[in-house]
Amino acid sequence: MSEAYFPVESGALGPEENFLSLDDILMSQEKLPVRVETPMPRLGAFFLERGAGSEPDHPLPQGTKLELPLWLAKGLFDHKRRILSVELPKMYQEGWRTVFSADANVVDLHKMGPHFYGFGSQLLHFDSPENADISQSLLKTFIGRFRRIMDSSQNSYNEDTSALVARLDETERGLFQIGQRSLNDFQSWEKGQASQITASSLVQNYKKRKFTNMED
């Protein structure tokens, strides 16, 4: 089946999201718990409940705790002025990092957050003292789950994989689909339904990047 739109690569695992990517747009809408460190003029009506100082000109007072979408929290965050501080979502805190380090494969990552790796990478934008631990946890979690994901994608031809896929975050689902497509292409070639085996898109993109680096 053809895709409904031309897929755009996510930038969430890098320093900034790619707002031409639907996955990044959805990820940037996920809520992040924050604490207001500097009163914000005329924002009380937007964020406070009715009757709690929500007049049009009422400021958002210092110490207010609320949840903001990631894109807004990043826009308001300032290292020098300290407009707001960010509280780590529970799945990135030390307790869950310990669980991931013990056996990341037992965790339903999609339930924890459909954009677990992308959202976690964007948390590094904020000056948490736990940033180094978060980045290491994300990397080790990905490595710990990668082999099982790819093994499953290569050994489930014409099988129901819905239970497995339901536990994967969106990045992992993309990898699983790549593995499934490669398996299906190989099976088609083996049955004589394809004229030749071609390099995967990952290999082709790697060669392009390598050639570009050589030119530079």
Swiss-Prot record:
The keyword Nucleus applies. GO terms for biological process: cellular senescence; DNA replication; multicellular organism growth. GO terms for cellular component: CMG complex; GINS complex; nucleus. Disulfide bonds: none annotated. Its main location: nucleus. SUPFAM superfamilies: GINS helical bundle-like, PriA/YqbF domain. It is found in: Nucleus; Chromosome. InterPro entries: GINS_A (IPR021151), GINS_bundle-like_dom_sf (IPR036224), GINS_Psf3 (IPR010492), GINS_Psf3_sf (IPR038437), PSF3_N (IPR055221). Keywords: Chromosome, DNA replication, Nucleus. Coiled coil: none annotated. It comes from the Eukaryota. Residues 1-16 are annotated as: Not essential for folding and stability of GINS complex, but may regulate accessibility to the central complex pore. Component of the GINS complex which is a heterotetramer of GINS1, GINS2, GINS3 and GINS4. Forms a stable subcomplex with GINS2. GINS complex interacts with DNA primase in vitro. Component of the CMG helicase complex, a hexameric ring of related MCM2-7 subunits stabilized by CDC45 and the tetrameric GINS complex. Belongs to the GINS3/PSF3 family. Required for correct functioning of the GINS complex, a complex that plays an essential role in the initiation of DNA replication, and progression of DNA replication forks. GINS complex is a core component of CDC45-MCM-GINS (CMG) helicase, the molecular machine that unwinds template DNA during replication, and around which the replisome is built. This is DNA replication complex GINS protein PSF3. It comes from Mus musculus (Mouse).
